[in-house]
């Protein structure tokens, strides 16, 4: 094959890729898990619902773009984004330095604090810790809380969803050698917690309060709320890192468009309103 033909073939291949990725025109495909209530879940009919689903439609309206919500298992979320199964992630994904090595994020649109959950009557109830600690700040209160947790969780089994910031924290050793049991979904974590297969579970606090309210189970939040450090700096829209080619430029524009839309949604009170509807409080950033 001549150099000229190779060049033409390369150009056509690039155009074909762009065509495949953006054939839907103005449509933005947004990936979500559909299994992390109240952030995102499904109703009895299988329809995707939740805070982020409703917010996604709001942001698309501000961008004057059509939207499509794509369901994706959590542990394959970032790989699917990189493979261009969809254009953005809205799935309760916290903005962390580790994830920013692979993808980029919009500005945060919601706060998410993590907390341990146990069944009522557990020996872990009543731990003497601060109400909340920020691992990015550190200090004596943080060190004291981690020491208390290390002692309380020694020999205990803590259940957690796989490939999450919560698993990363437990695996870090900050709370000692905990027996970590991982699950594919948060629903599986909740079920094993209430069935007694876990001494405790770690996730976003609202994931447990939502489950307890809907199931009637006696789930109790214990210990401090966690933020910062391994837990990140709020939840944002995950987008591919922009390259220098035409596709990369489209990703860069999409990031800018999401940031502008989040600004508008925040200013007009949309994020606060939707958060209060789904969380029962204003989690907007």
Task: Label every PLM stretch briefly.
Residues 34, 111-115, 213-259, 261-285:
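Periplasmic-binding protein-like
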């Amino acid at each position: 094959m001549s150099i000229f033909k190779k060049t033409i073939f390369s150009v056509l291949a690039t155009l074909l890729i762009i065509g495949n990725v953006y054939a839907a025109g103005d449509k933005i495909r947004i990936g979500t898990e559909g299994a992390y209530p109240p952030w995102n879940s499904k109703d009895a009919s299988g329809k995707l619902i939740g805070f982020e689903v409703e917010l996604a439609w709001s942001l698309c309206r501000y961008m004057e773009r059509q939207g499509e919500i794509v369901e994706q298992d959590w542990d394959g979320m970032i790989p699917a984004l990189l493979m261009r199964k969809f254009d953005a992630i809205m799935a309760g994904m916290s903005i962390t330095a580790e994830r920013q090595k692979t993808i980029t994020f919009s500005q945060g649109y919601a706060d998410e604090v993590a907390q341990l959950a146990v069944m009522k009557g557990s020996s872990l109830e009543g731990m003497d810790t601060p109400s909340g600690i920020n691992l990015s700040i550190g200090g004596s209160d943080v060190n004291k809380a981690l020491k208390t947790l290390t002692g309380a969780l020694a020999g205990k089994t803590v259940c957690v969803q796989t490939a999450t910031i919560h698993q990363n924290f437990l695996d870090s050793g900050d709370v000692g050698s905990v027996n970590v049991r991982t699950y594919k979904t948060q629903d599986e974590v909740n079920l094993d917690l209430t069935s007694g297969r876990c001494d405790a579970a770690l996730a976003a606090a609202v994931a447990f309060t939502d489950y307890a309210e809907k199931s009637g189970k006696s789930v109790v939040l214990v210990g401090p709320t966690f933020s910062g450090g391994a837990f990140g700096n709020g939840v944002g829209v995950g987008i591919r890192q922009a390259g220098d080619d035409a596709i990369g430029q489209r990703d860069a524009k999409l990031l800018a468009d999401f940031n502008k839309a989040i600004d508008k949604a925040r200013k007009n009170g949309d994020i606060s309103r939707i958060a209060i509807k789904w969380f029962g409080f204003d989690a907007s950033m």
